[in-house]
Structure formats: structure tokens, C-alpha cells
């Protein structure tokens, strides 16, 4: 069971709501994934009514909403978006995203740390999207973040665990859950992240842009479960030299 800020999750697959062709397909895919934590971009919500066609079906599905600050270019904008989410959605949870460069969507480490500190002081449950930087993740943990979300590769690229060496370091040292976010493009990527010891993964593009999002959601669900079970079972040690599985000469001596 995964626990974040005192809340237990049976599923270690978190999902997003963007890029689906319809709200109905989004909802059916989320149900198929069995995800219990779903991200929602504040920039997609009608600021006048506090709702859109996303929120009602998601609430009916019983998932926990994780509003994100995607689109924020600095700490000030991210803090504003988080406060807006708390007021409109009634949640302290926030996925902190600050990426001023619209081309590569790389997270701004300096602004993210500053915003995280302020939001934690204001009582938010902060889950920051960041580079796979072990030092930065330690700093975010120290200011009170409930989890850290290092990227596997750039958002939406489906490149997989490009940052694997650094993710391993983060997992090794972290005292809060590590959720691998961004760039996970195949169920095998998700399984591998879980085999490394990640606490969860967040997947959006790979499911939403699939020819069959519902089927792909099922695949990711199974992959995450298998990867976690493999980690808990204990994977064999990787070696450079061959190791025989049975005696090579015993039968010759008989």
C-alpha cells in the first residue's frame, strides 16, 4: 500500500486527463487503469464557474484530484494557481509544475524550490515535478514536500527512463515517495520504473494518444503491478561475468 500525506493508495499508477479525444474516453480509460489519483490542469478549468466537463465525471468516479500548476512560469504564478485550486476544488493537494520554456517544458528548479517552500508553509500537500536531480529532491523533501516527481524524460516524448542513473540515486536517498513523471511511453517503461523501486508512476500521453486508450490503460495497470511485485520479490543481481546455474564438471567425475 502506498501512503502519501497519510492517504493510502492501492494503485501505484497515477494518470492525467489531457489529450483524450473526449471526456467519456478519458473517464473509461481512468477506470480501466484503476488509478486513484488523477491530475487536472488548472488552466483547463472555467474560472467563472469553477468547473468544466472534466470535474463532474471524475468526482463521480471517486478518484482523488491532483490539480497541477502547468502553465506557470515562475513561483508567483504557481502559488496563485495552487491557491485558486484550493479555493475552487477544496483540496490542499497540488502538483507543482513550473516550466517557463514552452518548447522543452523543462522544470525551473530555482522557482520550483521557492514555490514549494511557500506552499508547504501554507499547508499544501506539495508534489513537485522536477528534473531527476538528487540534490534538488533532497532540498524539496527538507522544505516539506509530500513526494517528489522526477522526470524520466521530457514531457510527452515517450522516451522512457533516460534519467535512470539519477532516478536510482533519488530512490535510494528519499524518505518520501518517489513518483516517476513525464516521458513514460510504454508499459515496459512503467514496469522498469517500478522494478527500480519507484513508489508510483504518472502516465498521461502514452495512454491518451494510444489508438486504444482503454486497452493501453489496462496494459499500464498490469505493468505497474508486475513491476512492483518484481521489486518486492527481489530481482537478481546484474553481473558482467557469466555465472553457471549448475556444476559444469560434476557428471564427468562420476
UniProtKB/Swiss-Prot annotation:
Q: What positions does the entry give for 1-deoxy-D-xylulose 5-phosphate binding?
A: 156, 182-183, 204-205
GO function terms (MF aspect) = thiazole synthase activity
One GO cellular component assignment for this chain's record is:
cytoplasm
Keyword Cytoplasm in record? yes
Enzymatic class: transferase
Asked if the record carries the keyword Transferase, the reply is yes
Q: Which UniProt keywords apply?
A: Cytoplasm, Schiff base, Thiamine biosynthesis, Transferase
Report which reactions are catalysed by this protein: [ThiS sulfur-carrier protein]-C-terminal-Gly-aminoethanethioate + 2-iminoacetate + 1-deoxy-D-xylulose 5-phosphate = [ThiS sulfur-carrier protein]-C-terminal Gly-Gly + 2-[(2R,5Z)-2-carboxy-4-methylthiazol-5(2H)-ylidene]ethyl phosphate + 2 H2O + H(+)
The active site is formed by 95 (schiff-base intermediate with dxp)
Gene encoding this chain?
thiG
* Cellular compartment(s): Cytoplasm
Question: Upper lineage ranks?
Answer: Bacteria, Pseudomonadati, Pseudomonadota, Gammaproteobacteria, Alteromonadales
Species per Swiss-Prot/TrEMBL record: Shewanella sp. (strain MR-7)
EC numbers: 2.8.1.10
Pathway, per record = Cofactor biosynthesis; thiamine diphosphate biosynthesis
Subunit details: Homotetramer. Forms heterodimers with either ThiH or ThiS.
Name it.
Thiazole synthase
The task this protein performs is described as:
Catalyzes the rearrangement of 1-deoxy-D-xylulose 5-phosphate (DXP) to produce the thiazole phosphate moiety of thiamine. Sulfur is provided by the thiocarboxylate moiety of the carrier protein ThiS. In vitro, sulfur can be provided by H(2)S.
Q: Which domain of life is it from?
A: Bacteria
InterPro entries in the cross-refs = Aldolase_TIM, Thiazole_synthase_ThiG, ThiG
The UniProt family comment states: Belongs to the ThiG family.
* Pfam family membership, one: ThiG
